[in-house]
Amino acid sequence: MGWDSPSARLPMLLLLLAAPLSFDMKEIDTKLGVGYAVLIADVDGDKKPDIIVADTDRVVWYQNPTWKKRTIIQGKTKRDNVCIAAHDIDGDGRLDLALGADWRVPFDTSKGGTLQWLRQPKDPDKEWDVFPIGEEPTMHRIRWADLRGDGTMSLVSGPLMGRDSTAKGNWEDGRPLRLQAWAIPKDPTKPWKAETLDESLRVMHNFAAVPSSSGKGSDLLTASCLGVHRLSLADGKWRLKHVGTGDQSKPKGRRGASEIKQGRLKDGSAFIATIEPWHGDSVVVYTPDKAGGLWTRAVIDDKLRWGHAVWCADLDGDGEDEVVIGVRDNLSREDRGGVRIYKRDGDGWARQLLDAGGVAVEDLAVADLDGDGKPDIVAVGRATKNVRIYRNTGKK
């Protein structure tokens, strides 16, 4: 679990070793189907964060601190379940879930892709009720966000691809994909209405809600084949600004960016961490351009295969965020799938291999699970079919 330098030729990697963070690993499940998405939220209202996983044909949760597994739903949606987001949708004081399902492989860009919400019952051992929200082919990622800065949460949904896109056309020959926001109706069991925020991107693997540049509510950062963009509300209209190029080395292949999160440096300035290109092999950090142009792009690791998750969090309490990366596949015996942490020191970044080969990361999340003030990491594995908790014990 020591810090190392993935590649001396990469411009922002430190060659000096740094003090590694210490984690205790606990495996709480080894029988997932795929484990498409993991979420940390307080399901039962006891002020302790629980773990929620969207699996192939079910949604389950693990109760903190025993990690007893309970089934939320099974077989109530069109498989596969692919994305999940938590919010008290009906206002009864209990946490509910939005769920994207009917994920199809091979990709079907003309039909499929359902969006629904799950209402939590009073009895935690009963399955939850399912209510439809909408449909969009290749429904892939969802997030709750306060888009207008008035405290009202909307469900933002993004498909992977635009309608009628084809493999022959590099999934870019159909209509642009629709990034939509769904307002909760007065009676959420009734039909929901969607607002299209943007319809210009192609192959958007993920997006993140971040503090708005106006100081109220949230903007959206997108990772697509066109690179990194910021979607902001200005004068009542949603405007898309190009922030980063992404990896454009293969214009007819997988390109752009894939996973995305925003972090903070010690001076308070933001940085953006991505996996590039789509399902890519590089960890990239963007920092703002002083002249206001495209952000400066720096590859900090290129020794991975199929990066599939990113998070930014201050793991060591020094006032600056680290980057946590989940890797799905093995590149070599030395560079395996798992969980990696990147820490900034001066002008460089150093890498810590937290778990090399023990979890083929499909998704990960970071939050303080035990109330000790230190963020912990939860990762779910696709090929490994497991859920692992990495409890942050601090520096060695």
Label for each model-derived stretch:
Residues 10-19:
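Sec-dependent N-terminal signal peptides
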Residues 18-396:
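Beta-propeller-forming repeat regions
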